[in-house]
Amino acid sequence: QLPPTNFFNASSEFNTDDGIVDDDESILDLALSKFSSRMLRWHYRSKHESLINFSNYHFYQNNLIIPPSANDKFAITNNYLKKAIYSASTLKKKNAKESIGERGGVNIIEANEIADGVIAFMRESIKKNIKRSCLVVTMNNSQRDLIDEEIRHKATKIPEANTYIGMWDETMEPFTVKNLENVQGDERDYIFVSTLFGPNKEGITMQRFGPINHPKGHRRLNVLFTRAKQGLELYTSLTPNVIRDGGEKGRSIFKSYLDYAATQ
């Protein structure tokens, strides 16, 4: 369970790479002082072991009981974007039709690439009549809004994408784009993840990873990594070696997951 936080309640101008977070204790944390705990060991969500193996090792001490997969294909796709740039400061971005405003804490190339990936996923789903839901998750509100705008804009030119969005709107698993804080409780067949952070225009990767750097940031990552039932599409501008060792547990977990996704 994620503890409550005011991290994402700040205004749109708040620079979310600063790592300023105020967590309160969760209800479960408070209850532990009064009640005994018992682990629920059977894992049912992930249809492929590779979607849960990382969390099983790093968070559950390999205590989860995971049904074997029907095939050996690794269910996580690592889309590394070598030329992407993370802009922590405010900038102006325009799409093909109009300006979509000024904002900081965004990665434009990553937003475009993940939007293209989502649109392609939607088109294939409709053309091949494959019923599969999807959700996009990223690290802050600015990138969330940018990705959502890119997808909605691209979908106006792709009838299949519009059909897909409308088809899922009336279900329990509608298409949406969320930030890291708001994805707890969600699940979809496929999760698209924009890790957002990366080198700046000078080629320097700052070690500020927003809510991930918080003392409980690793728990947010665990929630993120375990939302997918069939597959996870990772879009990242980072390689594991640019993340320094040390610091909060969230940073080391983030680095380990990038390595896990890239080496399969």
What are these regions (language model features)?
Residues 63-152:
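Conserved helicase/translocase motor-coupling segment
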Residues 136-137, 192-194, 225, 233:
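Structural motif
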Residues 46-58, 161-165, 251, 261:
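The feature marks helicase ATPase cores and/or their adjacent C-terminal helical subdomains
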